[in-house]
């Protein structure tokens, strides 16, 4: 096949594509805008949060803040510069502990969302910071108390034939 016939074949293919209205390639920025218009119900919804600071609430009630570096189809997450925080809003206190790089299994994620880094510290300015160990012990006591209350409630409801599904790992 000669060079001229190859050029003609290529021109014919280009003309056919234009006639069939093949979409032109879009830039990465346009793709982000296009994808942001859709609500995903899968882990694909997380893609726009990569390399951004996020908040993650775990099933055991822990709250983690960090930069999302990667994730997989099971919503397993890798956070960098991760910080765990415990809030006691009634007493207007909080505690935090650096966790570094943190891997989270997707089955433990209750909720996640992006953090506005410009406003992140505003609520903390009005709160008193306490030692993390003290806060963790207080949280453990509160969780144990809640577990006993929920177990009692479950037994009471079971006597009336109502199933009450509460697990110790569901402290959120």
Swiss-Prot record:
GO annotation, cellular component aspect: cytoplasm; Lsm1-7-Pat1 complex; nucleus; P-body; ribonucleoprotein complex
Subcellular location: Nucleus; Cytoplasm; Cytoplasm, P-body
Biological process per Gene Ontology, one example term: nuclear-transcribed mRNA catabolic process, deadenylation-dependent decay
Any GO molecular function: mRNA binding
Gene3D superfamilies the UniProt entry points to: 2.30.30.100
Result of changing residue 105 to A: Slightly reduces affinity for poly-U RNA ends
Disruption phenotype: Increases the level of stress-responsive gene mRNA during osmotic stress.
Keywords: Cytoplasm, mRNA processing, Nucleus, Ribonucleoprotein, RNA-binding
Chain positions covered by the region annotation Disordered: 1-22
Main localization, broad class: nucleus
Domain of life of the native organism: Eukaryota
Disulfide linkage: none
Chain ranges of the Sm domain: 41-118
Listed InterPro entries: Lsm1, LSM_dom_sf, PTHR15588, Sm, Sm_dom_euk/arc
Note: Present with 3490 molecules/cell in log phase SD medium.
Subunit structure and binding partners: Component of the heptameric LSM1-LSM7 complex that forms a seven-membered ring structure with a donut shape. The LSm subunits are arranged in the order LSM1, LSM2, LSM3, LSM6, LSM5, LSM7 and LSM4. Except for LSM1, where a C-terminal helix crosses the ring structure to form additional interactions with LSM3 and LSM6, each subunit interacts only with its two neighboring subunits. The LSM1-LSM7 complex interacts with PAT1; within the complex PAT1 has direct interactions with LSM2 and LSM3. The LSM1-LSM7 complex interacts with XRN1.
Protein name from the UniProt record: LSM1-LSM7 complex subunit LSM1
Biological classification of the source: Eukaryota, Fungi, Dikarya, Ascomycota, Saccharomycotina
Gene designation per UniProt: LSM1
């Amino acid at each position: 096949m000669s060079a001229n016939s190859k050029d003609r074949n290529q021109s014919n293919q280009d003309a056919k594509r234009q006639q069939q209205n093949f979409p032109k390639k879009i830039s990465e920025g346009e793709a982000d805008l296009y994808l942001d218009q859709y609500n995903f119900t899968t882990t694909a919804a997380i893609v726009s949060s990569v390399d951004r600071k996020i908040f993650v609430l775990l099933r055991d009630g822990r709250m983690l803040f960090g930069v999302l570096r990667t994730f997989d189809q099971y919503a397993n997450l890798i956070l960098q510069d991760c910080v765990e925080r415990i809030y006691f809003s009634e007493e207007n206190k909080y505690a935090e502990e650096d966790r570094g790089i943190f891997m989270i299994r997707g089955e433990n994620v209750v909720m996640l969302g992006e953090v506005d880094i410009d406003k992140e510290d505003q609520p903390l300015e009005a709160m008193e910071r306490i030692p993390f160990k003290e806060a963790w012990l207080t949280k453990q006591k509160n969780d144990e108390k809640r577990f006993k209350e929920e177990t009692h409630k479950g037994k009471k409801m079971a006597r009336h034939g109502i199933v009450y599904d509460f697990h110790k790992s569901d402290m959120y």
